[in-house]
């Protein structure tokens, strides 16, 4: 509604389409598939030629003790949370200018020294990986842009959280956090580059 042109990507586009948003295009997208990454590049070339903001918000959470999680599930988490983020970022950067902004959504659990929760070995370590990746990219692209920042979120009431922790009530709704991410994506690069901001209304 603010006049921005948005490409919203999700494996399930039905909830996006039901919103009937103006200036918002969406299509089914699997971040682990090279062919889907190429579809995004083709769309940008055909319709925009330039991207101002990329929000990396893909996430897969498996809540299982390290002694029990199989390596296939561990790898699946990394395919989405790390390799997928790297792939889509690499594809979109050529369309961004110096004042562009790449915002990657991580987790407080991925920050060194933070409180860790048993069962989240794959998830938390993957979120730590994208923190380091963003810091590195900010350094690599500091002369040409775009800027890279990370929002390390605390608990937010999302479908992913509800599936992983049935019955848990997070202090923030998905809508509340989405509003914060939106504002930060548009203005945060004026003040930050290569930074990790912890976003949580609860302690720890």
Regions found by a protein language model. Name each.
Residues 4-16:
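Conserved glycine-rich Rossmann-like NAD(P)H-binding loop of the short-chain dehydrogenase/reductase
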Residues 65-66, 73-75:
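Substrate-binding pocket helix/loop in short-chain dehydrogenase/reductase
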Residues 89-90, 135:
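A short, exposed helix-loop element centered on a Lys and neighboring polar residues
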Residues 57-62:
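Conserved NAD(P)H cofactor-binding loop of Rossmann-fold oxidoreductase domains
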Residues 143, 150-151, 166-204:
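C-terminal helical subdomain
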Residues 21-35:
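Rossmann-fold cofactor-recognition segment
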Residues 103-129, 134-135, 139-143:
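Catalytic loop of short-chain dehydrogenase/reductase
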């Amino acid at each position: 509604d603010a006049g921005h042109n948005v490409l919203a990507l999700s494996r399930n586009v039905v909830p996006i389409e039901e919103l009937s948003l103006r200036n918002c295009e969406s299509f089914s997208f699997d971040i682990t598939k090279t062919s889907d990454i190429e579809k995004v590049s083709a769309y940008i070339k055909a319709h925009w030629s330039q991207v101002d903001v990329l929000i990396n918000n893909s996430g897969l959470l498996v809540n299982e003790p390290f002694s029990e999680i199989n390596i296939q599930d561990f790898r699946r988490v990394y395919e989405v949370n790390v390799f997928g983020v790297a792939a889509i970022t690499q594809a979109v950067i050529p369309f961004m200018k110096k004042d562009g902004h790449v915002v990657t959504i991580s987790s407080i659990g991925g920050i060194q020294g933070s409180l860790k929760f048993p069962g989240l070995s794959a998830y938390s370590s993957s979120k730590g990986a994208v923190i380091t990746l963003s810091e590195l990219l900010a350094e690599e692209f500091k002369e040409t842009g775009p800027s890279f920042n990370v929002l390390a979120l605390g608990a937010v009431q999302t479908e992913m959280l509800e599936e992983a922790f049935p019955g848990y009530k997070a202090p923030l709704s998905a809508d509340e956090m989405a509003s914060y991410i939106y504002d930060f994506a548009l203005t945060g690069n004026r003040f930050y580059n290569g930074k990790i901001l912890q976003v949580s209304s609860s302690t720890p």
